Amino acid sequence: MSTLPDEAKELLRRPLPAWATTVRPDGSLHNTVVWVDLDGDDVIVNTAVGRAKEQNLRADARVSVSMLDPEDAFHWVTVSGTARLETEGADAAIDALAKEYLGVDTYPYREGEERRRVTIRITPERVLYKPGA
């Protein structure tokens, strides 16, 4: 396990889009934009059950999440590790992310296939952090 530097945590706590990369069954990479939160050193992502990233992680738990500071392209963090999928508390997690990213108390798109949620908890195994120019 790797720990996140405080400066990297500060960046990851900002409501900025991040990119999550998972491994498809054929070995190719799947990249998608996500919202992130932190729980200690764990990176928290939330998705709808059945999405490609959730299916990919059930088959191969390796994942990498990157975030770039839009004000400084040389200020970024990448956290790579192993994901655990958690359904308990997933609705509260997406609501907390919606509060941070959208400024609303509840996630407004929870309908149809977006209804069932899963939290992706990423335990860092490798952290790359660039403090900026």
List where the protein language model places each region.
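A generic secondary-structure signal marking the coil-to-beta-strand transition
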Residues: 8, 16, 41, 75, ...
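Short, surface-exposed beta-strand-loop junctions and turns on beta-sheet-rich folds
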Residues: 51-53, 72
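Short secondary-structure boundary segments
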Residues: 48, 69-70, 124-125
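Short beta-strand segments
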Residues: 15-49, 57, 63-67, 76-78
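Extreme N-terminal tail/first-helix region
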Residues: 1-17
